[in-house]
Amino acid sequence: MATTGYRHGIYTSEQATSILPARTVDSAVVFAVGTAPVHTLAGDKARPVNVPQLFYSYDEAVQAMGWDADHCSDYSLQELIYSHFAIYRGAPVVCVNVFDPEKHKSEVADESLTFGTSVLDKDIARLAHGGVCAVELKDELGETTYEAGTDYSVDAVSGLLTRLAEGSIPEGGTVKAGYVYADVSKVTSEDVIGGIDPASGQGTGLELIDEVFPRFRLVPSIVLAPQFCEDPAVAVVMAAKCDGINGLFQAICLVDIPSSGDNAVTKYSDVPGYKEKHNLTDGLMVVCWPKVKLGDNVYGLATHLAGVMAATDGDHDGIPYASPSNKRLDITSSGYVGADGQWNELWLDLTKANYLNGQGIYTVSNFDGGMKTWGGRMACYPSNTDPKDAQDSIRRFFNWYQAQFILTYFAKVDEPLTRRLGQTFLKSEQIKLDGYAAREICLGGSITFDESENPVTDLIDGIMRFHLRITPPPAARDIEAVFEFDTDNLSALFG
């Protein structure tokens, strides 16, 4: 306690602890950009468009983003929300919905429908689309216009029409409907990529990754764009946004090589060529192929791999030093969607799966113990073989450790540059590294403050430079044993 004037007695004071505990950093914070059925939300609820939303549970995400059970595959964030929360129990997830029902919409001029086709209610008819507005009903000949509230009512969210008994629509009558509906197919890759509005300065799409830490104090570590990441233009931007988040942090992105639609790659031997042709070779990118299926739902492998990463980290104290390769996938098959829209299963043997791994591609293996992830390499492999760049667990550990270092010592910025300050860094980090080594999270690590790396010109300008050497364990990808027939043991035949 500070006192002034004449002192007479015993006084105490406090000094900052010379050793700092490490800041906690989540290792598997997913940042995902895509589409959600926000038009299904109740009328009094906000419809989040290009606003980061933080979720820790399935229920929380559905309540905030809406849910369309009849068109699950049409909304890419539904794929992630179900996979990550319901299947793999991962958290947290930050979602950005770019589907704007006020902007992305289409018009139907003359849809014919008949009341009474429902076996449950003879006064019910359903429009082909939900999320409707400006509904206009006419008789079958288009001569009489029916009045909403008098002849019929409409549920704008579901597109459900109800014939009112006191109205003029005949029982079992056929009508023609015109309306405008929210059309998620109007969302493009450009919406997901996003940018900065020059007038308002507001970010959209992937650009909003820089708002995650200021809003939620979470560092994004895994970037996803389900379905849209199959567009190489989106994938390349995802990788670019992973580097220098808030000017400080790094993440990795998980992308899928297309295995449905016009650009589908259906042969394993064609996958590496597609990867190279479209420049999917970034050191912060993981490339996945093919798609996977659970029940009737088809997913991008990248979506499931994100869940496996979160689960693997959770099994290792929330520290990303173990590879998510050779871990169980909660799927029933892997394959691709053909031009006819039908699902085609793929059964890659170990040789084919290893070929893809050797080209820096994650895939699915059913060699032992069911369907499992099979990979371990970042997209930069085999061109870049530096362990910190090429091995996924080491890359993620470096990203995580650097974020922890930044946040642990950020409060020390602008403190007096003294020997005590340097010792705080050295002692705190070495204690932590020794602890990691004892727990075999790292094989070893050290931190130094070398005079040779800190010239006087930097020191007088307030620049301190520490050198950390860390060795997270490589994944044991190739385990070999040599067997030999030992003739010496033949002597046992003679007692």
PLM feature spans:
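Acidic, low-complexity glycine/serine/threonine-rich segments
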Residues: 388-452
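Short loop/turn motifs at secondary-structure junctions
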Residues: 131, 218-219, 441-443
